[in-house]
């Protein structure tokens, strides 16, 4: 049956039991300051606390910080921290720990993907043990939104200093669940942390995340009673799941996007005309209809419907398939008969379907796509090393548009795997971070998207809805549009 918003229950929460969660990808990294994979964040929601969080309405709400003030024209943030909090290793959480976490993310030698998210932090001042003042170089509108995700997740300074870049092997936060084990391609196990500050959190004793790459196999395991919740719904099964009274289908409009990352630094796609030729072969509406049906919509940029800037860009229009344009761009790019490239995809039936549809479209003008299936963690490593031509990936989305764009498009950004650089885009991205009036930010993002749809470091394909499927036993789950599974207050009914 279809459920919008979450799994409310008139019953009181129950303690005990083990929650079994199915993931369609294997989490490659348990360090929030090194992680780049959306699937990592599923476990992070329960292993780490953040300075702030978001609620169902995407409003910023307190977590480790109980309150904050913004002063000095938007350049100074002063956070009051929750008292009597300890990390899972027993060391205290305080203002000194917050300062260490920011310094860790900002350390050039540590090379954190979070660095571009907190780059405007100029000074960290400990006012008292439970108060920290953060001064920015200039106003930064998305700062609180940034701190509601990985940049706001606090790790144990003692363990991080001891393990360095190996922190992922023994991750320690302050969340309601602590790390037990990680077996690659198999499972991640967390268990309740009895010293957590929120005494209403941690109803279930243990959370086991099982990696099951095939979405149909995920659903089959849920139906068989081997899982209590899965992080995706196979698109073709959504209509039937809406009618199925033995399971709960949770649906929200998503915040993210799906596309193709293009390596603009090497052949063939260091040739802009060839990027444009390939893009012109894509019929996004047909792709969505064939693979996703009602569960997705064609995209023209990184901002799905409802996010600031979603109707910006090329007049809000979806790019159309244009084979005459594709052939003209092939001639301009010096490849009138077409060319070949390798599209890397992660395992899974849906990913193969997407690649095959793209392959069948591109060949109409002589563009030949070789499809290579690569394990998720490996493809992230190859992205980081620019060892690819094109990769089919997505971004799970953030509540502020800056989080969907800046790190991927700014020169030298922590997630700029395309090697893209455009001085005008850099200027506009920085300006949009400072602007506080929505219409002004929207105009800046509109120009950025227009440029990106011409330069094509990322080819935006579609925006997907956020689906989760759960057993009838699961209660207390709140479904937020960022797609993250927050289990701190859920419980299992008999």
Question: Which positions does each model-derived feature cover?
Answer:
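N-terminal lobe/hinge region of extracytoplasmic solute-binding protein
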Residues: 22-72, 100-103, 172
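Long beta-strand-rich cores associated with HINT superfamily self-processing modules
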Residues: 468-494
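Surface-exposed binding/hinge segments that line
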Residues: 80, 114-158
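Structural transition elements
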Residues: 297-332, 350-353
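Alpha-helical secondary-structure segments
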Residues: 20, 94-101, 129-135, 175-176, ...
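Ligand-site clamp/hinge motif
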Residues: 194-240, 359-360, 368-370
């Amino acid at each position: 049956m279809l459920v919008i918003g979450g799994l409310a229950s008139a019953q009181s929460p129950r303690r005990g039991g083990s929650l079994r969660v199915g993931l369609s990808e294997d989490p490659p990294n348990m360090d929030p300051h090194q992680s780049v994979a959306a699937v990592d964040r599923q476990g992070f929601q329960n292993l780490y606390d953040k300075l702030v969080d978001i609620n169902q309405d995407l409003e910023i709400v307190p977590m480790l910080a109980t309150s904050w003030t913004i002063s000095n024209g938007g350049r100074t943030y002063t956070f009051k921290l929750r008292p009597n909090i300890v990390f899972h290793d027993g060391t205290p959480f305080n203002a000194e720990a917050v300062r260490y976490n920011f310094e860790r993310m900002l350390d050039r030698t540590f090379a954190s993907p979070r660095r571009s998210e907190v780059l405007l932090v100029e000074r960290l001042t400990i006012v008292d043990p439970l108060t920290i003042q953060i001064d920015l170089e200039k106003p930064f509108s998305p700062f609180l939104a940034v701190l509601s995700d990985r940049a706001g997740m606090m790790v144990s300074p003692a363990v991080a200093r001891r393990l360095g870049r190996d922190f992922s092997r023994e991750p320690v936060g302050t969340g309601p669940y602590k790390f037990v084990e990680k077996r690659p391609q198999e499972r991640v196990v967390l268990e309740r942390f009895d010293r957590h500050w929120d005494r209403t959190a941690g109803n279930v004793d243990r959370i086991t995340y099982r990696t099951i790459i095939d979405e149909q196999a995920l659903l089959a395991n849920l139906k068989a009673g081997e899982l209590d919740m899965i992080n995706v719904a196979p698109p073709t099964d959504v209509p039937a799941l809406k009618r199925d009274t033995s399971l709960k289908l949770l649906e929200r409009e998503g915040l993210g996007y799906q596309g193709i990352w293009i390596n603009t630094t090497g052949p063939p796609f260091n040739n802009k005309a060839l990027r444009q030729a390939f893009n012109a072969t894509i019929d996004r509406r047909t792709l969505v209809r064939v693979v996703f049906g009602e569960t997705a919509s064609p995209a023209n940029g990184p901002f799905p419907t409802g996010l600031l800037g979603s109707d910006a860009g090329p007049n809000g229009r979806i790019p159309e398939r244009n084979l005459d344009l594709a052939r003209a761009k092939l001639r301009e790019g010096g490849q009138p008969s077409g060319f070949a490239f390798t599209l890397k995809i992660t395992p899974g039936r849906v990913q193969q379907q997407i690649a095959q549809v793209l392959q069948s479209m591109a060949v109409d003008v002589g563009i030949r796509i070789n499809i290579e299936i690569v394990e998720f963690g490996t493809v992230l490593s190859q992205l980081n090393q620019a060892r690819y031509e094109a990769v089919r990936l997505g971004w799970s989305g953030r509540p502020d548009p800056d989080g969907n764009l800046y790190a991927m498009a700014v020169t030298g950004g922590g997630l700029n795997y395309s090697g893209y650089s455009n001085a005008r885009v850099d200027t506009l991205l920085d300006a949009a971070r400072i602007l506080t009036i929505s219409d002004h930010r929207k105009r800046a993002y509109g120009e950025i998207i227009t440029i990106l749809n011409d330069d094509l470091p990322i080819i935006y394909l579609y925006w997907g809805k956020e689906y989760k499927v759960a057993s009838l036993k699961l209660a207390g789950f709140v479904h937020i549009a960022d797609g993250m599974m927050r289990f701190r207050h859920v419980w299992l009914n008999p």
